């Protein structure tokens, strides 16, 4: 019988889908395909690191279901993934999250049974991380998973995401375009694919209003899920061939178009990735090349945000 023993066994093995109408209208010479991470059980790429960080901590004897209180700072999707895994395994979970994150994120976290503590939006992810550290130090039997520093984050992308992309493209991938939050996805995938195909290039996407990877200063922006305002420990910048900065307006516009012209409902960071992918696909040197862009999350948790507001 083909029956998963629990929900976490359904994480990964997400499909690729080719974009048709948008690249045609934009005059793209390269092919753009999307890795639909929104088809994971809790609807984001973070499901992968959620299960791997918890599994590794269990294997190392650091945490135990029913005894350990898990704590994590999150912009939303990692929190949702951890809440799903914690519910399935029997952990209590406290999440710290900037108050600027969407209402749907908050509702989903509570639906899974997680406790949520909001931090000032002006402090960004830095304030969120500091509060999580305070809780981890003050509460009994608490353990902080630390997605920004945890090697289990890029590891799962080396073991799963990279190989899925390689196999599903028959090794034909030329470019990966991925937004950088923790940097785990681009680090894990690029580290594997660069060994398999030396000509492969990894392109990082960041907010133009917080261009830290490009050497700029951190700042407030509307692209939830990327642009943490610092360079995370798990991000290997040496694997990045190019950084493309995207405006809030571009991310919103392309996120909307993806839903309306391709039928793919996604979050704002997917819109940012698409904006960058189109720039790469339009370059004459990239004619007939294959670009794989990551869809980090499904769009239902963004319906209250500027991405899907004021639609006609």
Swiss-Prot record:
Its cofactor is pyridoxal 5'-phosphate. One of its GO terms (molecular function) is cysteine synthase activity. GO terms for biological process: cysteine biosynthetic process from serine. Gene3D superfamilies: 3.40.50.1100. The keyword Thylakoid does not apply. The modification N6-(pyridoxal phosphate)lysine is found at residue 46. The keyword Acetylation does not apply. It catalyses: O-acetyl-L-serine + hydrogen sulfide = L-cysteine + acetate. Pyridoxal 5'-phosphate binds at residues 77, 181-185, 269. It is an enzyme of class 2 (transferase). SUPFAM superfamilies: Tryptophan synthase beta subunit-like PLP-dependent enzymes. InterPro entries: Cys_synth, Cys_Synth/Cystath_Beta-Synth, CysK, P-phosphate_BS, TrpB-like_PALP, TrpB-like_PALP_sf. Pathway: Amino-acid biosynthesis; L-cysteine biosynthesis; L-cysteine from L-serine: step 2/2. It comes from the Bacteria. GO terms for cellular component: cytoplasm. It holds the Pfam family PALP. Its EC number is 2.5.1.47. PROSITE patterns: CYS_SYNTHASE. Belongs to the cysteine synthase/cystathionine beta-synthase family. This is Cysteine synthase.
């Amino acid at each position: 019988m083909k029956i998963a023993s629990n929900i976490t066994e359904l994480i990964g093995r997400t499909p690729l889908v080719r974009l048709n109408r948008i690249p045609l209208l934009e005059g793209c010479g390269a092919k753009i395909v999307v890795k639909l991470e929104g088809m994971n059980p809790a609807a984001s790429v973070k499901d992968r690191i959620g299960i791997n960080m918890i599994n590794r901590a269990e294997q190392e004897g650091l945490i135990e279901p029913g005894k350990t209180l898990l704590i994590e700072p999150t912009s939303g999707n990692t929190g949702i993934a951890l809440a799903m895994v914690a519910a399935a395994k029997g952990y209590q979970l406290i999440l710290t999250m900037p108050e600027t994150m969407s209402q749907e994120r908050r509702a989903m976290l509570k639906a899974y049974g997680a406790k949520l503590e909001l931090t000032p939006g002006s402090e960004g992810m830095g304030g969120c991380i500091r509060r999580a550290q305070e809780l981890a130090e003050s509460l009994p039997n608490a353990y902080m998973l630390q997605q920004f520093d945890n090697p289990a984050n890029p590891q799962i992308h080396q073991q799963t995401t990279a190989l899925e992309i390689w196999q599903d493209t028959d090794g034909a991938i030329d470019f990966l375009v991925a937004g950088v939050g923790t940097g785990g996805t681009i680090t894990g995938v690029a580290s594997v694919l660069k060994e398999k195909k030396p000509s492969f290039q990894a392109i990082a996407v960041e907010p133009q209003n917080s261009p830290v990877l490009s050497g700029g200063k951190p700042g407030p922006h509307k692209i939830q899920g990327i642009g943490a305002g610092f360079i995370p420990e798990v991000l290997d910048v040496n694997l990045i061939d190019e950084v493309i900065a995207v405006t809030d307006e571009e991310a919103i516009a392309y996120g909307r178009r993806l839903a309306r012209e391709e039928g793919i409902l996604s979050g704002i960071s997917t819109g940012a990735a698409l904006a960058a992918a189109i720039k790469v696909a339009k370059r004459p040197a990239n004619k007939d090349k294959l670009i794989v862009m990551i869809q980090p999350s499904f769009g239902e948790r963004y319906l209250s945000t500027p991405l899907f507001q004021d639609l006609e």
